[in-house]
């Protein structure tokens, strides 16, 4: 499971992504060049800041807020964005709250957001941009065409990184079946997997911001990554030191800086190999990753299989009778595992010759 970064910002962007009725209303105001200040919140803390204006309490619609934004005051919407509570209201946040904004709307929006920890949106009349505030978060919404261009560039980059990862992984597969994998091969595969996943995270951010305009990008992403993260986690589980929790190791690798990720010795250290030569240290996989590729074998059976034999090489050497002794594996499943591993080995050898 990936560590969630900027979770609060992603939630905000989801609310305001293209295709939502709120974004439609904001875009209408933007095109009209009237400017606007909108607050999402109906709790007492927000309502105490409202001075004057009209208590509308009307159902929300993009057309309504477009018309109401023509007045100078702020609009107050319910947190679920289903009703418009106030229009043309003056907001009176605490003036001692620091803000580096210059325009009146933006200063008020930032202060309200900091004071109440609710979403405040300022639409600039002259600069033609939408700025969102919540707590200490400030984010300027970008045009969909700009985000789409960045997302397409990121997809192209991802394709190249996935191609490199596939080459590295296939090389590791060959070495694992021969029990000749070195620490260098393993750390390189983990490094490349993490690089791919970081690009995936960036693209997922673009998809959230694109809303319904990001469907094609989302389809391309799903086609490219498939089971890459799962394979990466199982790779760590195969090679991390016995007493280490593989999920904790995965989290530590996610927290590495871009510079540290380029250092294979640091990745080896995270796996528990301190002061070991990357090239000269032979390591044997436990077999979680390769066993997981055998079709129709439940995860609990794989746990029992690896728990019984300990290493992939012993699983490969085991006959049907030995496999049959493992809990959850009968005669039919033993044959399925043996044949499945044989087919995977043949496929790996075939890829080597391509």
Swiss-Prot record:
This protein's name: DNA integrity scanning protein DisA
NCBIfam families: PRK13482.1
Family matches, as Pfam families: DAC, DisA-linker
Family per record: Belongs to the DisA family.
Reactions accelerated catalytically: 2 ATP = 3',3'-c-di-AMP + 2 diphosphate
Origin species: Clostridium perfringens (strain 13 / Type A)
Keywords, comma-separated and alphabetical: ATP-binding, DNA damage, DNA repair, DNA-binding, Magnesium, Nucleotide-binding, Nucleotidyltransferase, Transferase
Complex formation: Homooctamer.
Domain DAC span(s) in chain numbering: 6-144
The organism's place on the tree of life at top rank: Bacteria
The UniProt record lists the keyword Transferase: yes
Leader sequence segment: none
EC number of the protein: 2.7.7.85
Cofactor field: Mg(2+)
